[in-house]
Amino acid sequence: MAHSVKIYDTCIGCTQCVRACPTDVLEMVPWKGNNKAGMIAAAPRTEDCVGCKRCETACPTDFLSIRVYLGPETTRSMGLAY
């Protein structure tokens, strides 16, 4: 499936999204940004994303630091395409 996963710099490095992903799309990588963990989520295997959005649900930040954008084949099958 052709989903894209976007990680924003509001990520606090808590690893909740990584642990929630059933297909191991996400991993933590070193980051020199403004979080105490010194790590940020990354999505090196987006081709394995099934679009379940468990990562979004698991994210504890008010900013929703991770977003899954469903591919056109999924939105079409769900009746969400224009």
From Swiss-Prot:
Membrane-topology annotation of the record: Peripheral membrane protein
Reactions this protein catalyses: reduced [plastocyanin] + hnu + oxidized [2Fe-2S]-[ferredoxin] = oxidized [plastocyanin] + reduced [2Fe-2S]-[ferredoxin]
Keyword 4Fe-4S: yes
Binding residues for [4Fe-4S] cluster 1: 11, 14, 17, 59
Cofactor binding, per record: Binds 2 [4Fe-4S] clusters. Cluster 2 is most probably the spectroscopically characterized electron acceptor FA and cluster 1 is most probably FB.
Ranges for domain 4Fe-4S ferredoxin-type: 2-31, 40-69
Any one Gene Ontology BP term: photosynthetic electron transport in photosystem I
The organism's place on the tree of life at top rank: Bacteria
GO molecular function: 4 iron, 4 sulfur cluster binding; electron transfer activity; metal ion binding; oxidoreductase activity
One Pfam assignment: Fer4_7
Enzyme Commission identifier(s): 1.97.1.12
GO cellular component, one term: photosystem I
Broad EC category: oxidoreductase
Binding site for [4Fe-4S] cluster 2: 21, 49, 52, 55
Required co-factors: [4Fe-4S] cluster
Gene3D superfamilies the UniProt entry points to: 3.30.70.20
UniProt keywords, alphabetically: 4Fe-4S, Electron transport, Iron, Iron-sulfur, Membrane, Metal-binding, Oxidoreductase, Photosynthesis, Photosystem I, Repeat, Thylakoid, Transport
Location(s) in or outside the cell: Cellular thylakoid membrane
Functional description taken from the UniProt entry: Apoprotein for the two 4Fe-4S centers FA and FB of photosystem I (PSI); essential for photochemical activity. FB is the terminal electron acceptor of PSI, donating electrons to ferredoxin. The C-terminus interacts with PsaA/B/D and helps assemble the protein into the PSI complex. Required for binding of PsaD and PsaE to PSI. PSI is a plastocyanin/cytochrome c6-ferredoxin oxidoreductase, converting photonic excitation into a charge separation, which transfers an electron from the donor P700 chlorophyll pair to the spectroscopically characterized acceptors A0, A1, FX, FA and FB in turn.
Subunit structure, as described in the record: The cyanobacterial PSI reaction center is composed of one copy each of PsaA,B,C,D,E,F,I,J,K,L,M and X, and forms trimeric complexes.
The protein's name in its UniProt record: Photosystem I iron-sulfur center
Lineage start: Bacteria, Bacillati, Cyanobacteriota, Cyanophyceae, Synechococcales
